[in-house]
């Protein structure tokens, strides 16, 4: 497919190319991934400024979204990627591949830092808010890796879903403490005051008057922030298909019920009496659970729950309305969320 960038995408691409440190805050639907990949391609094959790029993302985004975007767009097909997920042997094999871009899920960043001898001259953090906890192992691993990296891009839709305090860790990774300070205590003392406390024990902080404007001013020179409502003429509703894939075993069960109208499961037998019943049973299986003939619920997979969890996380505190088909869908969603 031919990529026809919007003007805001052209601006963001050039911004990444001209800024060694970039915080790119784009709403859902504004094309963060293809924008970043286009900048990577230009830096790699036009100006020859980078040779090896590391992308850190949530598991399903790392495994599916980034590789799919590279395959989707004609101008990106020159980029070779290796997806570093799965078991330790699978990850080791992925790192041994000759690639332009290595894509790792954030849960394996610590492992990558401790076990990989590869040098990366550019890092992309897809969902920068994953690094808002300055006490997490992944934050410490990225903090240690950061001085060896020439270029870094942080992607997110909503950078401070839980307030301004989150920004410190995110920008500590990006600019190594240049703008908001090297230490969280320094940042707190400068921009916040104690809120809820019990004697000398402080449970929460609130921004000082004018702190928000001062913080945004400090990070403005490396930040691009765009909202979909400002840059896209959008209809009242935009439908985006979020596909999930079943494992071989899950697909075999689905096909067996579809073909024979009966399926033996550990939790009981499932029978479809007619075409209408079969459609309902297959819909249940696609959603992840199914009612047996005895009205018990048997879980088949969590694929849609995993995808929903990613969507809720990317909303970063914004309201999300979730519709469900079956009662067991509601129960499983509530249990997961």
Predicted regions and their residues:
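Conserved helix-turn-beta segment of the N-terminal RecA-like "Helicase ATP-binding" lobe
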Residues: 61-86, 174-177
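Conserved Helicase C-terminal RecA-like lobe
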Residues: 1, 18, 31, 35-41, ...
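Conserved Walker A/P-loop ATP-binding site and its immediately adjacent core
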Residues: 35, 50-72, 161-166, 325-328
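Conserved P-loop NTPase motor "coupling/switch" region that bridges the ATPase
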Residues: 52, 78, 122, 130, ...
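Conserved helix/coil segment N-terminal to the catalytic DExD/H
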Residues: 88-122
